[in-house]
């Protein structure tokens, strides 16, 4: 399962024997749109968030699950029931720009202060002093930033795929442009606003179908435009990570929201770099980091420098960790939470 990370604490809270034990069927039933809970709309921090819940409000320990890009709260469908059965109040927002949540037109409305402010306002709405926050992909980046900006409101951190990224001496997009070129998608989203949005909107089904794949054959590194061109590929590579009915949930969601709101998160990376200039960069909360060994996102070699209380799990999967290996992901989360209760 696990390849050790150089110069990094190694602890796999999920023994092989534990991972082989099946989760009770009643905790693994939310696997399609008809099983997924109906949303509430909660006004917080100047926006309306579409929020899905499991468990009893105020009757369990709060845990907030934060999706990535291009995703939706539905990405957590396999984890919600199991966490609720373990006594948690599970709160899963479509963050601003996604689903039926508000989509402000001002690009700066998607910076880390606004995104983390939404989550803090959700805690205030429910009357919680703090919560455990779980993030995948861009959701992980939001949870890292949230923990830096509001450390007293974060009890524990669980992040998937994207590790803590140190701030560095130069703004992130400037660094990426120098290293990867101006057609790298992070840079392209910032330097050519609206272009990628239009391509994704015009090829919504193909883009999402081609994105949500696993076991994609190895290939030579592609130019930075490869992600944008993915929207135009007629025959996808690898295998799908979800059923057609599940894919329909994401396609319908982006038909309603478009892609601009989510891409605006990327357009605030340099702004976020400035906003985080004066915060303490060390995260002290107990943290679980879950990597996919086949993920193209690189593992951090300096994680314990900035997150000293981290434990690491490596799963044999790609980027869409909680959807590719839902049972193993849920078990890793539940056992770690039990150990840190």
Model-identified regions with their sequence ranges:
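Active-site loop/turn elements of alpha/beta-hydrolase fold enzymes
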Residues: 95, 162, 317
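Short, Lys/Arg-enriched N-terminal segments with co-localized hydrophobic residues
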Residues: 20-29
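Flexible "cap/lid" subdomain of the alpha/beta-hydrolase fold that forms the substrate-access gate
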Residues: 31-38, 48-49, 55-57, 62, ...
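Conserved HGGG/HGGXW glycine-rich cap/lid loop of the alpha/beta-hydrolase fold
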Residues: 47-102
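Catalytic active-site module of serine/aspartate enzymes centered on a nucleophile-bearing elbow/loop
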Residues: 11-19, 310-341
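Active-site helix-initiating loop/hinge in glycosyltransferases
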Residues: 68, 111, 324-325
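Conserved beta-strand scaffold positions in the cores of enzyme catalytic domains, especially
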Residues: 39-41, 90-92, 289, 312-314
């Amino acid at each position: 399962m696990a390849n050790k990370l150089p110069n990094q604490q190694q602890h796999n809270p999920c023994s092989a024997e534990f991972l082989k034990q099946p989760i009770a069927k009643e905790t693994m039933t939310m696997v399609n749109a008809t099983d997924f809970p109906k949303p509430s709309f909660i006004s917080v921090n100047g926006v309306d968030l579409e929020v899905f819940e499991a468990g009893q409000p105020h009757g369990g320990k709060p845990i907030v699950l934060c999706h990535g890009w291009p995703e939706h709260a539905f990405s957590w469908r396999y984890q919600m029931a199991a966490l609720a059965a373990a006594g948690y109040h599970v709160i899963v927002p479509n963050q601003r720009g996604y689903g039926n949540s508000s989509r402000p037109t001002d690009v700066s409305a998607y910076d880390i202060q606004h995104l983390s402010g939404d989550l803090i306002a959700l805690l205030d709405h429910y009357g919680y002093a703090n919560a455990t926050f779980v993030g995948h992909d861009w959701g992980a980046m939001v949870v890292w930033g949230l923990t830096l900006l509001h450390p007293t409101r974060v009890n524990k951190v669980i992040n998937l795929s994207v590790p803590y990224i140190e701030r560095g001496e130069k703004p992130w997009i400037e660094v990426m442009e120098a290293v990867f070129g101006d057609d790298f998608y992070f840079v392209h989203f910032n330097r050519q606003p609206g272009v990628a949005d239009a391509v994704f909107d015009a090829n919504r089904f193909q883009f999402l179908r081609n994105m949500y794949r696993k076991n994609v054959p190895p290939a030579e590194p592609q130019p930075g435009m490869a992600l944008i061109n993915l929207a135009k590929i007629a025959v996808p590579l690898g295998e799908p990570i979800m059923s057609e009915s599940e894919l329909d949930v994401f396609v319908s969601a982006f038909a309603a929201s478009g892609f601009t709101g989510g891409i605006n998160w990327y357009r605030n990376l340099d702004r976020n770099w400035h906003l985080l200039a004066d915060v303490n960069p060390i995260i002290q909360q107990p943290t679980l980091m879950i990597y996919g060994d086949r993920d193209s996102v690189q593992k951090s070699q300096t994680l314990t420098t900035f997150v000293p209380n981290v434990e690491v799990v490596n799963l044999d999967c790609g980027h869409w960790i909680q959807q590719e290996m839902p049972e193993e992901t849920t078990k890793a989360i539940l056992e770690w939470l039990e150990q840190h209760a």
